[in-house]
């Protein structure tokens, strides 16, 4: 509800009012889509799109790729916390959009939650294969058998890795039983660190031994960690259909693109240098 003007005779700027109404709607209902904002504000969708574009360009709101939702920007709210998922996704989304344009295959961004990796963003809607079964946001996948879980697990700190192992040892989820095999875990970490990326376990990629436990979705993936100030905060994958390319081919063609994207995301989360003179 707008208050009466304290400056009689001075006209308000209607365009600015519309912009502030939309900004307030996004702030009070983060995750609203265009349809929701249309219902909240009563503004025509064409007007809303122009306002939202302006707010986005001014770094006041941003749009999540996975579902088209609009959220208030976290930029300018002080130093980023390493556990701030919203700021992580905000930093990653434009980078993931550009990655998809370069490589044409989709990616997901995920971080650990309760011994699994939870998808928090995907550029699948921007890819040439939007039907590929990855994500959606909120989906949780295996820590030890997926490439994205392996990338996180193998590059995170020793204490965090031990905590993840303890969680998995108490789990009955398929694949988590490997957490009770120290030699298997040691081989996984050593191999992943040596090659510099996580690779999907064959059980998840058509190996007959996985039949009945892990439905074959016809795809494969590789992943790299996102490291901020020496700490792994998430992992980023690249996924494709196996009939289109081998792991060797994807690594040769696109691993450097994936690493560059992870580094760019990390750079956007690094604390600002507040140096100066005493």
Which residue stretches match the model-derived regions?
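An N-terminal domain-start capping segment
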Residues: 7-32, 101-132, 138, 256-278
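Short, solvent-exposed recognition segments
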Residues: 131-215
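Amphipathic alpha-helical regulatory segments at dimerization interfaces
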Residues: 40, 91-102, 106-108, 188-191, ...
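Juxtadomain coupling helices with adjacent low-complexity linkers
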Residues: 208, 214-217, 232-278
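N-terminal helix-turn-helix
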Residues: 1-89, 263, 267
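A short, aliphatic-rich beta-strand micro-motif
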Residues: 220-226
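Amphipathic alpha-helical effector-binding/dimerization core
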Residues: 67, 71-169
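Short clusters of small/polar residues that mark proteolytic maturation junctions
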Residues: 65, 122-124, 203, 237-238
């Amino acid at each position: 509800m707008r208050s009466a003007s304290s400056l009689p005779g001075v006209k308000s700027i209607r365009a600015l009012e519309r912009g502030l109404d939309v900004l307030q709607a996004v702030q009070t209902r983060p995750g609203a889509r265009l349809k929701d904002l249309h219902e909240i504000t009563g503004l025509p969708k064409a007007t809303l799109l122009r306002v939202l574009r302006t707010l986005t360009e001014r770094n006041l709101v941003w749009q999540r790729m996975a579902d088209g939702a609009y959220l208030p920007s976290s930029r300018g709210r002080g130093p980023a916390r390493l556990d701030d998922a919203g700021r992580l996704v905000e930093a990653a989304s434009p980078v993931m959009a550009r990655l998809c344009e370069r490589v044409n295959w989709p990616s997901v961004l995920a971080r650990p939650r309760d011994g699994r990796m939870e998808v928090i963003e995907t550029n699948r809607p921007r890819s040439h294969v939007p039907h590929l079964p990855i994500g959606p946001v909120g989906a949780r996948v295996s820590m030890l058998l997926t490439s994205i879980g392996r990338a996180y697990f193998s590059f995170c700190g020793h204490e965090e890795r031990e905590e993840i192992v303890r969680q998995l040892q108490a789990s009955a989820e398929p694949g988590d039983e490997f957490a009770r095999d120290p030699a298997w875990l040691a081989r996984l970490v050593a191999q992943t660190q040596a090659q510099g990326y996580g690779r999907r376990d064959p059980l998840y990629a058509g190996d007959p031994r996985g039949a009945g436990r892990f439905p074959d979705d016809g795809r494969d993936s590789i992943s790299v960690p996102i490291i901020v100030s020496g700490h792994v905060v998430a992992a980023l994958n690249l996924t494709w259909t196996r009939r289109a390319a081998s792991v060797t081919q994807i690594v040769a063609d696109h691993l450097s693109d994936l690493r560059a994207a992870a580094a760019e995301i990390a750079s956007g989360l690094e604390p600002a240098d507040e140096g100066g003179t005493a």
